[in-house]
Curated annotation (Swiss-Prot):
Subcellular location: Cytoplasm
Protein name per the record: Glyceraldehyde-3-phosphate dehydrogenase 2
Marked site (Activates thiol group during catalysis) residue numbers: H176
One example of a Gene Ontology biological process annotation: glucose metabolic process
Species classification: Eukaryota, Fungi, Dikarya, Ascomycota, Saccharomycotina
Length: 331
């Protein structure tokens, strides 16, 4: 049984807890969030505007959450280094704050007594692993990153296409649901002026490092992909539009067949496939990293094609976080 703690009880932290509770080999020992009291943590875990009410009993005793009779300690420390991870025998600390995402800052969990750390954000210093893409390269590193939700959607698709046909170059656009960093009304956003505009009433162009990050988990695609984002007024589920120049000619039917085969074999559970006339809400709660929309893609020529893949940027990503935790625990 691997003992885990969750630092940061936001959108990802709460969903990681939901998913981890369903895994028999994981025990969630503690959560930490300096901005959430234990009674409020119970309320936020029990009710979710996007994913619905938690299917179980949730209460608290003033110090711990009590979920279906199981106690989960709640701390309110700003500095992870002060957390009692050693005393609580924490094997893996999951950092979902979005703050402690580099090796030096995530090291605070190790200093506190945790054996390993999984970061739920892209990192420029910690090695990044995308389940289904490069998890076989994990060699026992102490601190790892699960990359971003968009990289988790894009990388499996890019791997399939590159292995089958070769990618010479490509551009990605993610049409991305609202996240917590955006504004309910126009407000200050000094680094990204557009990002400070009302989330619910605008399509907002934004930057993303998700496509470039694919080169970190698939070195053969280094320098071949870049991309951007449009933030749109939906609460969850996003979609990747990948336009690529192929090295080898292919028909769209051949591309569909290759993706479908991968989704049923080596990437089962990570890559999904659909030919239905779907829309974004059809993927709420979907646990795949990426669901290929066979009916949405288009082809201009045998070597130039646009591919479309959906992802629940909250639930699918959080599922992969827990998968990565299990992988790290085995090594």
């Amino acid at each position: 049984m691997v003992r885990i703690a969750i630092n940061g009880f936001g959108r990802i932290g709460r969903l990681v807890l939901r998913i981890a509770l369903s895994r028999k080999n994981i025990e969630v020992v503690a959560i930490n969030d300096p901005f959430i009291t234990v009674d409020y943590a119970a309320y936020m875990f029990k009710y979710d505007s996007t994913h619905g009410r938690f299917d179980g009993e949730v209460s608290h005793d003033g110090k711990s959450l009590i979920i279906d009779g199981k106690k989960v300690l709640v701390f309110q420390e700003r500095d992870p280094a002060t957390l009692p991870w050693g005393a609580e025998k924490i094997d893996i600390a999951i950092d979902s704050t979005g703050i402690f995402k580099e090796l030096d800052s995530a090291q605070k969990h190790i200093d506190a007594g945790a054996k390993k750390v999984v970061i739920t954000a892209p990192s420029s210093t910690a090695p990044m692993f995308v389940v289904g893409v490069n998890e076989d390269k994990y060699a026992g590193q102490t601190i790892v990153s699960n990359a971003s939700c968009t990289t988790n959607c894009l990388a499996p698709l890019a791997k399939i296409i590159n292995n089958a046909f070769g990618i010479e170059e490509g551009l990605m656009t993610t049409v991305h649901s609202i996240t917590a960093t955006q504004k309910t009304v126009d407000g200050p956003s000094h680094k990204d002026w557009r990002g400070g505009r009302t989330a619910s009433g605008n399509i907002i162009p934004s930057s993303t490092g998700a496509a470039k990050a694919v080169g970190k988990v698939l070195p053969e695609l280094q320098g071949k992909l870049t991309g951007m984002a449009f933030r749109v007024p939906t609460v969850d589920v996003s979609v990747v539009d990948l336009t690529v120049k192929l090295a080898k000619p292919a028909t769209y039917e051949e591309i569909k067949a290759v993706v479908k085969k991968a989704s049923e074999n080596e990437l089962k559970g990570v890559m999904g496939y659909t030919e239905d006339a779907v829309v974004s809400s059809d993927f709420l709660g979907d646990t795949h990293s990426s669901i290929f929309d066979a009916a949405a893609g288009i082809q201009l020529s045998p070597q130039f094609v646009k591919l479309v893949s959906w992802y629940d940027n909250e639930f699918g990503y959080s599922t992969r976080v827990v998968d990565l935790v299990e992988l790290v625990a085995k090594n």
